[in-house]
């Protein structure tokens, strides 16, 4: 059982290295008398003797076997324990065989006893401690394995016994040893006192220092190891146990070399991966050679950077070879059929070393002249799709007739986005043939009588030439189409007469060009009036005719009165203010049934406007919780509102600072008078006001994410394009509502737009732009014509003439679009306000922000038309954004750096890196100065090293925002391209 048990002992319990023994006392090293204390004096005797190697040593012997009452003690000198908890005693001695002594009494013994006595200092005397078992502590009775006889003495044969005993725990500063003899005949040749400790060892990647053994033979003293240089703990804290014999047992846990370092010298050293090799993860595995087309720039690399012109996709593992962009597709074949086209091609000669090759089709319409080509509209259809084609063919339809097109077939793969260069492409030029117009999409009923119906329709989406005329086909619904009648019309409106009363008719229309008729539209059903309906409509119109006449008369009188009043006032008010006020009176007739905004400053008593449009709230219903900001008139707080019978809601509370003037109070509450007239999901909602107690408050719904510009900057790069378009659509819908009410905002900007927890954007800050004349602290607003104007957001006619209209709000909305797509970047960057005015006067416009779809930038440019009459209405903007949301593919085409638009764009390209002396200057130029220290501490201090940075390197220096990562990576890619250009010139 014993041998079998030993074979099955777990390896973890076997000692790793031999114990270290530290000697406290060794009698063999004495060069003079030992001077140990004996009792009685006739007992032990110190003599010179020889060890087994015949070296002279000092020994003690005793042999009083023929004497009576033998109790002989031998006590060592004071021995200091030096921190040891368990003491070991090695004794070498010889014992005479009692049977070999002639006439020996029966009391002869062949053993002796070992004792110890602890003391904090050397306190022993001739009589202390007492020469008896108590106070001494007995260790053991020592017996000899071998005894010598008279024969051995004659032959000079030495039979020396060696015994080791241990005792503990010891706690005092030192101790004495004592040897007791009872009628024995023996010689104590050597005594060595020592303690054991576990040696310093490097095991499992950790360094364990020397550790004293425990106080008991079964003790296990835990010792924490420290990982060797460039290693880290795995799983659990690493430790081993030192047993009572000074042996390491039970190792737990381990350390492994960090990424970039491999284990050498039997696991005692973590060495940095040599140049040309790398190690990506922590572990025992060694460094491996860099994949193809990659290299390392220093020792200890965790990955290999791609060589110039080669890249690694975000999803590629680090041990994958670096690849490059594919070459252009080959052998393009085109087949044109009227206004459709089939394109086929063969794959590129070089796929770049990757298997994820796909194709993108870029369609450009070049018209029939020699003008610049523009991207095709959304009406062109691509089958199976325009982007991400896996097969080398595509069918394109719904092209315009007699039109020249250029199609670029781009070859792209997983690293195309990593390259600073545009994808390689093959292009083909085609001209479409003559084709008939497309079908009319929809018809509208303009009016009807008992015997006639007037219809109108829009032009076909693709007329494919000049529309010569239209043919309208109609028949009674309950009859066959064979009974149809055709009517021709040179315009898109026709009145069909001689119809039956109260009858449903089916109508279809088609357009004609020189190429012939197009397809009929879908069937539309319209019904003539019955006689009863006709009589009823006549009776209903009679009061309307009388009322309209009366209203017209009242309107004329009102205009005359206004003119007289204005003349009497001698044009006391400025032209812009008069125009604004007159607009409120004269535009009401434009949208019947539509609520019209009323300027509170037209009230003789502005407090009356507050009472009319804002609900008074009792102060007891309002609970202010914390200050979240400061406004023009006082603090902005968050809190709760609990109205009787309603649930408690979270609200924002604007307070009027103490010491206000009556004018400040009136101006403060005017915003509530304005806001209280609005009710739209994309316009901030007024809950009410507190005017009958102090402080005066305006209470609105609470918007959790605060102002849009700050929110975007805090979440740079975190949203999809569709999410951003959704935000823009909300702002446009709110502005359409305000424009329909004839309200001009004057200060539309991302800072004046609030965002709630559902990313719903709401227009806010109403009427405050009227009072900015008193605010000299905000550099956003610059003096112009006696007032303060936010130059960067304001239309040129409003800057020059203070002519604010819904069209000038559209200009501001275009700037808001730019702010949203750039994640809150400052419009016109660090240009001065005067430089902005000059640039706009010279027809310069902002370029597309990074990753901005072309369709969105084109909409911005439409908003920035110099002629305000050419700018889109907010309703048109909402419709355009709705189309983009319904057709996300329209947002995939990114705006080029140099747009094909007529307006020149301000240059905000990345400057040449050679114009900078240091990496810090380069970071300043790309507005990433907050990462200077991180770059320096990580060793990225030269342009050569920076140009080789990868996404992993950028993450390692602490750039965690996706937008910042993309901006830095784009700049590095441009830097590489500039370096390659310089190298090619040098060659």
UniProtKB/Swiss-Prot annotation:
The chain crosses the membrane at residues 545-565. Heterotetramer upon binding of the ligand. The heterotetramer is composed of an ephrin dimer and a receptor dimer. Oligomerization is probably required to induce biological responses. Its EC number is 2.7.10.1. It is a single-pass type I membrane protein. Residues 914-978 form the SAM domain. It comes from Coturnix japonica (Japanese quail). Residues 566-987 are cytoplasmic. This is Ephrin type-B receptor 2. GO terms for cellular component: axon; dendrite; plasma membrane.
């Amino acid at each position: 059982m014993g041998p079998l048990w030993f074979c099955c002992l777990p390896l973890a319990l076997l000692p790793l290295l031999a114990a270290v023994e530290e000697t406290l006392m060794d009698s063999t090293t004495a060069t003079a008398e030992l001077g140990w204390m004996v009792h009685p004096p006739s007992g032990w005797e110190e003599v010179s003797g020889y060890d087994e190697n015949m070296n002279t040593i000092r020994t003690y012997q005793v042999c009083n076997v023929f004497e009576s009452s033998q109790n002989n003690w031998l006590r060592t000198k004071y021995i200091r324990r030096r921190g040891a908890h368990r003491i070991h005693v090695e004794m070498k001695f010889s014992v005479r065989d009692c049977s070999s002594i002639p006439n020996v009494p029966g009391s002869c013994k062949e053993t002796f006893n070992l004792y110890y006595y602890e003391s904090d200092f050397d306190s022993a005397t001739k009589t202390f401690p007492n020469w008896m078992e108590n106070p001494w502590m007995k260790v053991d009775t020592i017996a000899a394995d071998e005894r010598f006889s008279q024969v051995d003495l004659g032959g000079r044969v030495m039979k020396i016994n060696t015994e080791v005993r241990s005792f503990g725990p010891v706690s005092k500063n030192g101790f004495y040893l004592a040897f007791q003899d009872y009628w024995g005949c023996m010689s104590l040749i050597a005594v060595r006192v020592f303690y054991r400790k576990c040696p310093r060892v490097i095991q499992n990647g950790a360094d364990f220092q020397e550790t004293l053994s425990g106080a008991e033979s079964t003790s296990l003293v835990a010792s924490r190891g420290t990982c060797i240089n460039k290693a880290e703990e795995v799983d659990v804290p690493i430790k081993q146990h030192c047993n009572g014999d000074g042996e390491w047992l039970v190792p737990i846990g381990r350390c492994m070399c960090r990424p970039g370092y491999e284990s050498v010298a039997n696991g005692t050293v973590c060495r940095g991966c040599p140049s040309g090799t790398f190690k990506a993860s922590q572990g025992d595995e060694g460094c491996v050679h860099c994949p193809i087309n990659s290299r390392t720039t220093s020792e200890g690399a965790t990955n290999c950077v791609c060589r110039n012109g080669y890249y690694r996709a975000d999803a590629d593992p680090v041990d994958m070879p670096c690849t490059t962009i594919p070459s252009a597709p080959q052998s393009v074949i085109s087949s044109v059929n009227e206004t459709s086209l089939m394109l086929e091609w063969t794959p590129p000669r070089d796929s770049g070393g990757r298997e994820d090759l796909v194709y993108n089709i870029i369609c450009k319409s070049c018209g029939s002249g020699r003008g610049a080509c523009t991207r095709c509209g959304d009406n062109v259809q691509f089958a199976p799709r325009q982007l991400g084609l896996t097969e080398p063919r595509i069918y394109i339809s719904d092209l315009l007739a007699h039109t020249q097109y250029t199609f670029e077939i781009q070859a792209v793969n997983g690293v195309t986005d990593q390259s600073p260069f545009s994808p390689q492409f093959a292009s083909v030029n085609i001209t479409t043939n003559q084709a008939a117009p497309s079908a009319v999409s929809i018809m509208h009923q303009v009016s009807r009588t008992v015997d006639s119906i007037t219809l109108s329709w829009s032009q076909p989406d693709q007329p494919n030439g000049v529309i010569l005329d239209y043919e309208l086909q109609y028949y009674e619904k309950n009859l066959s189409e064979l009974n149809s009648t055709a009517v021709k019309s040179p315009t898109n409106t026709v009145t069909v007469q001689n119809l039956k009363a109260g009858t449903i008719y089916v109508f279809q229309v088609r357009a004609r060009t020189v190429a012939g008729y197009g397809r009929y539209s879908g069937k539309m059903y319209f019904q003539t009036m019955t006689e009863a309906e006709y009589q009823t409509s006549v009776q209903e119109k009679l009061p309307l005719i009388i009322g309209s006449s009366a209203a017209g008369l009242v309107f004329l009188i009102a205009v005359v009165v206004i003119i007289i009043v204005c003349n009497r006032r001698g044009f006391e008010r400025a032209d812009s203010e008069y125009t604004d006020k007159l607009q409120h009176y004269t535009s009401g007739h434009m949208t019947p049934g539509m609520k019209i905004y009323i300027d509170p400053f037209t009230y003789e008593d502005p407090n009356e406007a507050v009472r009319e449009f804002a609900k008074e709230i009792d102060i007891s219903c309002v609970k202010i919780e914390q200050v979240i900001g400061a406004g023009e008139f006082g603090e902005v707080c968050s809190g709760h509102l609990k109205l009787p019978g309603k649930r408690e809601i979270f609200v924002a509370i604007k307070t009027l600072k103490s010491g206000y003037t009556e004018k400040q109070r009136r101006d403060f509450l005017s915003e509530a008078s304005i806001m209280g007239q609005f009710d739209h999901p994309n316009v901030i909602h007024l809950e009410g006001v507190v005017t009958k107690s102090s402080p005066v408050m305006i209470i609105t719904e609470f918007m959790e994410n605060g102002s849009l510009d700050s929110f975007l900057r805090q979440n740079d790069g975190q949203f999809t394009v569709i999410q951003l378009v959704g935000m823009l659509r909300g702002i446009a819908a709110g502005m359409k509502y305000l424009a329909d009410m004839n309200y001009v905002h004057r200060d539309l900007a991302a800072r004046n737009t609030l965002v709630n927890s559902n990313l719903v954007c709401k227009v806010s800050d109403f009427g405050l732009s009227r009072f900015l004349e008193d605010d000299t602290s905000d550099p956003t607003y610059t003096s112009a014509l006696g007032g303060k104007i936010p130059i960067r957001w304001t239309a040129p006619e409003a800057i020059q003439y203070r002519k604010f209209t819904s069209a000038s709000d559209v200009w501001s909305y275009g700037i808001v679009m730019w702010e949203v797509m750039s994640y809150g970047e400052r419009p016109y960057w660090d240009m001065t306000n005067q430089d902005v005015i000059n640039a706009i006067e010279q027809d310069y416009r902002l370029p597309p922000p990074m990753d901005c779809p072309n369709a969105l930038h084109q909409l911005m440019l439409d908003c920035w038309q110099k002629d305000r009459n050419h700018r889109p209405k907010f309703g048109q903007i909402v419709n355009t954004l709705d189309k983009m949301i319904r057709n996300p593919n329209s947002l995939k085409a990114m705006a080029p750096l140099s747009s094909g638009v007529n307006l020149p764009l301000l240059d905000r390209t990345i400057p040449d890196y050679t114009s900078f002396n240091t990496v810090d200057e380069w970071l300043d130029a790309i507005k990433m100065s907050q990462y200077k220290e991180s770059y320096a501490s990580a060793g990225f201090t030269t342009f050569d090293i920076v140009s080789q940075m990868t996404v992993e390197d950028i993450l390692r220096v602490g750039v965690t925002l996706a937008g910042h990562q993309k901006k830095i990576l784009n700049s590095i890619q441009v830097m590489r391209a500039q370096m390659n250009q310089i190298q090619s010139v040098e060659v």
